[in-house]
């Protein structure tokens, strides 16, 4: 196993999913405490100790990376620390490093292989006009919590940018978000995103859509950024911290996979078949480098397929759905096909929606702004997609994913007894809405 960093686990475990969720949990608790005044319970304003918060985050990561290292050792996995680049179809040259992926440890090592699985991931995309300044960070830098800025700009309205905007806003920063497209959270249906927008309108100073950054200048007062577009401020704005979250670039070219004969696209992706096999039969590729969506759970599933296929098993990647979750507040989650995709692909569908304003548990939690939506094939009534917006939506979407994989229809889901009172029963109730038998909502008006 060739790994350039000091710990195993890749982006997700070290500088992605896990540390961000540790900080998002902290942010959620801070925000939740503020709402308790309406319940008759008030607290003093929080006192933030950044060193302790960083230590908490680091402890979470260390516990998991340590466990992963232990499992690798137990399975007798030989780890080589360094940066690997292909020499040909059966050799990889590794430049040995100290573990920070930069400092040479001295020497190189050539590894001969019969079969290889490429899991080299991706790097945060950069904007060429951004100066080299510690006050301009990517997601990795933002997770290090260098400071709590008075004003912060998030460039990019995708999931990563919005999650970090959530964290820094809860810690006390004033946030501007700029997105060149006409909406944030690309990929999710707009009705889900609208709930997020309404809830977060008071949280951020500006959400500038159809707007882009055109220049940035480092000054003693901060990073001075100029904008252009529909919502661009007339004058440049100055920020204490700028997060650039404009996507990620796969590392297909960086590892020189083409020298092994592997087809690498202009953007750095590696094409694979359903066994995760490249055009070179004994070389496989998984994860970010094998194509969108760039999600850890997709990569893990692909890794299982590739390992089994490499060992001779007839394993294939044939998932009907890959769930996506924005761990914002409220969370937004979806699985299967979206309404937008149904319309684009001319799929005949029907949807059913259960509002959390009718959920006893959501009301008791003081978080009834969300809803659960299921999408069914118009002819078969089998579920083909679904979306949930609200607190803990990410924990709820798995049932929708399983229902899609199992080919459940609305009756299967509606007749499944869900525990009461829970948020998960909104899934069963949405199916009942589709069948016209939901007694938890007023009767539907006849056309």
What are these regions (language model features)?
Residues 11, 136, 161-164, 170, ...:
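Short glycine/serine/threonine-rich phosphate/pyrophosphate-binding segments
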Residues 3-148, 181-185, 189-192, 198-203, ...:
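Glycine-rich flavin
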Residues 160-180, 198, 277-282, 290, ...:
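Active-site substrate-recognition segment that forms the wall
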Residues 78-81, 85-101, 111, 171-274, ...:
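A Rossmann-like FAD-binding core segment of flavoenzymes
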Residues 133-149, 235-310:
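FAD-site-proximal beta/loop scaffold in flavoenzymes
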């Amino acid at each position: 196993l060739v790994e350039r960093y000091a710990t195993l686990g890749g982006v997700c475990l070290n500088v992605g999913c896990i540390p961000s969720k540790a900080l998002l949990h902290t942010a959620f608790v801070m925000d939740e405490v503020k709402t308790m005044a309406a319940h008759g319970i008030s607290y003093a304003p929080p006192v933030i100790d950044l060193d302790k918060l960083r230590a908490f985050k680091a402890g979470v990561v260390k516990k998991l990376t340590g466990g992963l290292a232990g499992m690798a050792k137990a399975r007798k996995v030989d780890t080589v620390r360094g940066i690997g680049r292909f020499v040909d179809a059966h050799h990889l040259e590794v430049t040995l490093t100290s573990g920070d992926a930069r400092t040479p440890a001295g020497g190189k090592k050539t590894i001969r292989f019969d079969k290889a699985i490429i899991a080299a991931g991706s790097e945060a995309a950069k904007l060429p006009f951004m100066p080299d300044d510690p006050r301009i960070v990517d997601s990795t830098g933002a997770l290090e919590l260098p400071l709590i800025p008075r004003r912060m700009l998030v460039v990019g309205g995708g999931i990563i940018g919005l999650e970090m905007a959530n964290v820094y806003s809860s810690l006390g920063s004033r946030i501007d978000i700029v997105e060149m497209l006409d909406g944030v959270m690309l990929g999710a249906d707009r009705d889900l995103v609208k709930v997020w927008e309404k809830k977060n309108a008071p949280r951020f100073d500006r959400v500038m859509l159809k707007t882009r950054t055109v220049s940035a200048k480092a000054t003693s007062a901060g990073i001075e950024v100029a904008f252009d577009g529909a919502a661009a401020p007339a004058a440049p704005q100055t920020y204490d911290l700028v997060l650039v979250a404009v996507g990620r670039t796969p590392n297909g070219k960086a590892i020189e996979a083409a020298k092994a004969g592997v087809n690498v696209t202009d953007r750095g992706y590696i094409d694979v078949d359903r066994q995760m096999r490249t055009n070179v039969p004994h070389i496989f590729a998984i994860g970010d480098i094998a194509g969108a969506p760039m999600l850890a759970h997709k990569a893990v599933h692909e890794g299982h397929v590739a390992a089994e296929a490499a060992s001779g098993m007839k394993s294939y990647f044939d998932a009907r759905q890959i769930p996506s979750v924005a761990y914002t507040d409220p969370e937004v989650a979806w699985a299967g096909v979206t309404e937008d995709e149904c319309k684009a692909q001319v799929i005949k569908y029907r949807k059913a929606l259960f509002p959390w304003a009718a959920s006893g548990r959501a009301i008791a939690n003081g978080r009834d702004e969300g809803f659960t939506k299921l999408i069914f094939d118009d002819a078969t009534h089998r579920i083909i997609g679904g979306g949930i917006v609200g607190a803990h939506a990410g924990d709820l979407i798995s049932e929708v994913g399983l229902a899609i994989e199992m080919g459940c229809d609305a009756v299967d889901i509606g007749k499944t007894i869900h525990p009461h009172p829970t948020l998960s029963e909104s899934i069963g109730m949405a199916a009942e809405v589709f069948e016209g038998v939901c007694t938890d909502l007023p009767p539907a008006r006849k056309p």
